[in-house]
């Protein structure tokens, strides 16, 4: 490595920092605290953490600070993962030793170790210098040198990420660079600080959503080392002294070098709340060596085009010691940060924004077309050279100044600007967009703005407005032809046309009832739109999707308003889980695979840690396991609520048992030999059904080894599908929309994997039908007429088992989500029919007239579940031929909910009172697994639906004069619930 005489000298000096003069054990006033440290093995991270936690909990804050500083400055504890003021390896962030230091406390240490910091700064400047020149191998040598001198820091992590990005974006072909990157990650034990590593990687990854990643970081509530550092990557300029000290303290907890760089950066930036000239002159001059080097976008990217400003913005926190980078990030980040923290205004950044856009006063001054010359500027907005990012923030700046009140000409310009802006729907305040929509003088603008509103504000009201606008515009101008509407918008703005195309998926189109007559028509319209757009844009993925939809139209018959393929995984909740828990880990693993020294894709699904694809495989297996095993939105939730809670057994056996009392066959059971044989057959049949329910129709696990649904890639057919998933992910990942498409691609392939188990499940049901579902009896004596009666009975039994097993097999078809909309009264009728399959005597007197109430979206499964619980209980405990009334209405004080009321008749007032008592008892005990409460799990489920937000205002009461039991609840139109253990 590159080490000069001064470097070696400072290395030796830093190895013995404790001798320079810092906190000594005797400086800690508390005898108790000193004794805790004396009894600690300084090489043990756990013991040292435990001792410091005891001091934190039993001594004063001052004692704890001094004890922690003693550990961080003493050479005795140099090997522990807690870290030191100067470190050669990253500290372990998994500790609860977070403590806040003041600016004055940290400055004291910076001035005390000024000489050491100056030499580290000189080495850091060499790293920056060689990066700027494109000498990445030499820069990595100096990175190693910095670590050897105990200069491991967040600064070093940022530079490693920057070099990694250059390798990918510039498409370098140098295995030595990859080897050095891998070596440095191991050298500094980067995995100890996995949260910071992930934050740096994901924020600067140009394929991931910047807003989603930033929001996840800003929404972190718990305190831990590194949290404030990560937040400073998103919000680089602190609003006040308290915020500044909070971030500074977190940097100080990582390394003294990082704390020095943070103070120096803002001494150079001249924040009003910070005293000037806090640092020694020589220290500040050493910092200037780092900050004076300016990275040029021309060197950073292969081409400088309309997206270069956005790319530069995404990466600027990696090198924001450079004043221009800090300024550029602060100006444009102001609007991105404001998108999810609108209640917090940073006045310092606001002043920078006003200065940057001071030369812009009207929409006519913005950019409307591509150009040949692009320059990323941090001083002033320039429409002649700006890219899409700068043009977008300029537009939002003007919209805020005008409060969304645009004149006729500006309304036309707003639509045209959609072809040269980005992220407007996510970043522009929704109030501004709502104002523009309310004053829009033409359908075109209203359509564009309502599309933008639904991007970041998907409520029942906003989607209704968008549907209404699309239908009004389409009917008035294009005779109801959506394809002509898309083509017209494409001539105005390809970006708007593409956005509308993505909005108008099959589910959305099925709700355009004025121009799409039937749900199946939505598939055809969607296919036509995708085909046209694929042709005009030369995008094969749109053409492929169009072909698949047209095939679906041919092979799938219209199933009515309710999909009878009952198995279901909620794609919304799964995507939410994926974005919260998996997207960061998976993108980092894919990046590591793509830049690894031996990037060979060799999937091994049984030994995840083998080969370079091991991390990716492990994470994809976790995605598949969640898809199957999650008890709220996965396959397991369906198996729990639909198979194991009564439907399966009732459907399989109820009508067979009814044959005992059937007038046509009742006399046959007077034959004891026949009755005994049928009893034995039915007993074996029911044992088989019970075995299926308890052991086969389960997620396979150690407890359920015979489960039909495996979360492993355990068959050759599954391996083929899983291998295709990896190659598909790698294929789309390099594209701009790759990361956004990951959830839908993974869901699609998860269904392909599950479909193999579904096929095996249906095969198993068929085998069980053949082995246990066939009854035959021929009496030894009697006339031909007499024997024909037994033969007819056997045919009746076998016909019933064939019918029921065919029905149950259909429950394990891969679902078609093309039309998730239905009339709630039809939904009610479907539940009645299903419950009748389990209770043959259940014939309620229903009077619902010609009422109808249409609801769209996959959420009607919640209504289905709630009604099933209530009607199933009514059939079991109520009057089998009693009155039943069902009403749907909109509450007067609510716009985002519907009210559902169910009235069921019981045999007597005593039965009503008993039912009320049983319900109250059931609702008192809503803890535990639903399987443990066979008779009460229904009421428990209703309570859980209420607790997780899918329904509300759940209440029950009686009408004594009519012997009626009444259930009343609200269904929340805006809620998809939380992904907790809802259906356990």
From Swiss-Prot:
Modified residues (Phosphohistidine): 645
Post-translational modification (record): Autophosphorylated.
Organism domain of life: Bacteria
Entry GO MF terms: ATP binding; kinase activity
Catalysed reactions listed for this entry: ATP + protein L-histidine = ADP + protein N-phospho-L-histidine
EC code(s) of this entry: 2.7.13.3
A biological process term (GO) from this entry: phosphorelay signal transduction system
Keywords, sorted A to Z: Antiviral defense, ATP-binding, Kinase, Nucleotide-binding, Phosphoprotein, Transferase, Two-component regulatory system
Function summary: Sensor-kinase member of the two-component regulatory system Detocs that confers resistance to bacteriophage. When the system (DtcA-DtcB-DtcC) is expressed in a susceptible E.coli (strain MG1655) it confers resistance to bacteriophages T2, T4, T5, T6 and SECphi27. Detocs inhibits T5 infection leading to growth arrest but not complete cell lysis, during SECphi27 infection leads to cell lysis.
Protein's name according to its UniProt entry: Detocs histidine-protein kinase DtcA
Species assigned in the record: Vibrio alginolyticus
């Amino acid at each position: 490595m590159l080490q000069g005489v001064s470097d070696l000298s400072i290395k030796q000096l830093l190895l013995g920092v404790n001798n320079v003069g810092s906190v000594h054990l005797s400086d800690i006033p508390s005898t108790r605290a000193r004794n805790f440290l004396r009894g600690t093995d300084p090489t043990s991270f756990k013991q040292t953490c435990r001792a410091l936690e005891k001091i934190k909990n039993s001594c004063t804050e001052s004692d704890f600070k001094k004890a922690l500083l003693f550990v961080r400055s003493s050479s005795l504890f140099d090997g522990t993962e807690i870290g030191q003021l100067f470190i050669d390896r990253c500290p372990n962030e998994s500790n609860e030793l977070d403590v806040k230091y003041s600016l004055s406390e940290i400055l004291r240490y910076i001035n005390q170790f000024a000489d050491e910091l100056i030499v580290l700064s000189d080495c850091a400047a060499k790293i920056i210098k060689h990066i700027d020149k494109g000498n990445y191998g030499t820069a990595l040598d100096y990175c190693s040198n910095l670590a050897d001198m105990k200069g491991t820091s967040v600064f070093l992590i940022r530079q490693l990420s920057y070099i990694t990005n250059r390798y990918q974006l510039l498409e370098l072909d140098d295995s030595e660079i990859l080897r050095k990157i891998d070596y440095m990650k191991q050298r500094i034990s980067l995995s100890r600080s996995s949260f910071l590593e992930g934050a740096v990687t994901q924020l600067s990854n140009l394929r991931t959503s910047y807003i989603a990643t930033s929001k996840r970081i800003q929404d972190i509530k718990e305190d831990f080392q590194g949290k404030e550092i990560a937040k400073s990557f998103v919000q680089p300029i602190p609003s006040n002294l308290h915020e500044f000290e909070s971030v500074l303290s977190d940097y100080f907890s990582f390394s003294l070098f990082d704390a020095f760089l943070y103070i120096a950066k803002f001494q150079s930036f001249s924040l009003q709340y910070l005293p000037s000239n806090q640092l020694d002159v020589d220290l500040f001059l050493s910092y200037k060596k780092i900050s004076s080097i300016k990275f040029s976008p021309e060197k950073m990217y292969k081409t400088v085009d309309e997206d270069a400003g956005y790319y530069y913005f995404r990466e600027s926190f990696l090198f924001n010691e450079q004043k221009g980078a800090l300024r550029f990030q602060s100006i444009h980040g102001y609007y991105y940060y404001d998108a999810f923290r609108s209640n917090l205004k940073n006045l310092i950044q606001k002043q920078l924004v006003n200065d940057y856009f001071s030369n812009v006063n009207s929409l006519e001054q913005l950019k409307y077309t591509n150009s040949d010359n692009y320059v990323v500027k941090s001083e002033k907005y320039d429409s002649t050279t700006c890219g899409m990012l700068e043009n977008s923030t300029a537009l939002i700046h003007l919209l805020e100044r005008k409060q969304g009140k645009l004149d006729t000409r500006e309304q036309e310009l707003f639509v045209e600007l959609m072809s040269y802006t980005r992220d407007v729907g996510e970043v522009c305040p929704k109030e501004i967009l709502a104002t523009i929509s309310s004053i829009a003088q033409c359908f075109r603008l209203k359509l564009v703005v309502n599309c933008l509103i639904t991007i970041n504000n998907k409520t029942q009201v906003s989607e209704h407005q968008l549907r209404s606008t699309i239908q009004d515009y389409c009917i008035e101008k294009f005779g109801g032809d959506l394809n002509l509407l898309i083509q017209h918008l494409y001539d105005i703005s390809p970006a708007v046309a593409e956005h509308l195309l993505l909005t108008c998926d099959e589910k959305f189109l099925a709700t355009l009832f004025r121009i799409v007559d039937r749900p199946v028509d939505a598939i055809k319209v969607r296919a036509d739109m995708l085909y046209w757009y694929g042709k005009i844009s030369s995008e094969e993925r749109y053409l492929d999707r169009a072909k698949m939809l047209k095939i679906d139209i041919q092979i799938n018959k219209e199933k009515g308003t309710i999909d009878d393929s009952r198995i279901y995984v909620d794609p919304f909740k799964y995507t939410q889980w994926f974005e919260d828990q998996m997207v960061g880990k998976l993108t980092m693993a894919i990046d590591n695979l793509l830049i690894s020294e031996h990037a060979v894709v060799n999937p091994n699904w049984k030994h995840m840690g083998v080969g370079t694809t091991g991390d990716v495989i492990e994470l994809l297996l976790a995605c598949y396991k969640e898809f199957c095993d999650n008890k709220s939105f996965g396959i397991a939730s369906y198996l729990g609520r639909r198979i194991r809670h009564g439907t399966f057994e009732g459907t399989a056996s109820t009508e067979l048992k009814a044959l005992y009392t059937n007038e046509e066959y009742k006399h046959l059971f007077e034959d004891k030999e026949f009755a005994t044989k049928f009893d034995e057959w039915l007993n074996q049949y029911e044992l088989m059904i019970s075995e299926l329910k308890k052991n086969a129709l389960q997620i396979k696990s150690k407890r359920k080894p015979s489960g039909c649904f495996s979360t492993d890639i355990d068959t050759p057919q599954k391996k083929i599908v899983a291998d295709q998933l990896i190659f598909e992910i790698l294929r789309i990942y390099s594209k701009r929309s790759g990361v956004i498409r990951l959830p839908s691609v993974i869901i699609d392939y998860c269904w392909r994997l599950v479909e193999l188990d579904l096929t095996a499940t249906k095969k198993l049901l068929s085998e069980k039908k053949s082995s246990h579902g066939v009854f035959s009896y021929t009496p030894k004596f009697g006339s031909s007429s007499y024997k024909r009666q037994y033969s007819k009975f056997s045919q009746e039994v076998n016909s019933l088992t064939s019918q029921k097993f065919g029905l149950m097999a259909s429950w394990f078809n891969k679902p078609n989500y093309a039309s998730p909309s239905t009339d709630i009264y039809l939904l009610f009728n479907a539940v009645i029919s299903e419950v009748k399959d389990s209770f043959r005597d259940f014939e309620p007197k229903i009077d619902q007239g010609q009422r109808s109430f249409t609801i769209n979206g996959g959420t009607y499964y919640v209504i289905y579940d709630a009604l099933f619980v209530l009607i199933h209980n009514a059939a079991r405990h109520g009057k089998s031929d009693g009155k039943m009334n069902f009403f749907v209405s909109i509450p007067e004080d609510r716009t985002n909910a519907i009210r559902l009321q169910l009235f069921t008749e019981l045999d007597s007032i005593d039965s009503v009172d008993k039912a009320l008592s049983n319900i109250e008892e059931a609702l008192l005990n809503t803890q535990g697994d639903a399987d443990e409460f066979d008779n009460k799990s229904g009421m428990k489920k209703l309570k859980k639906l209420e607790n997780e937000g899918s329904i509300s205002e759940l209440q029950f009461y009686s009408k004594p004069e009519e012997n009626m039991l009444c259930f009343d609840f609200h269904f929340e139109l805006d809620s998809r619930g939380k992904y907790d253990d809802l259906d356990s």
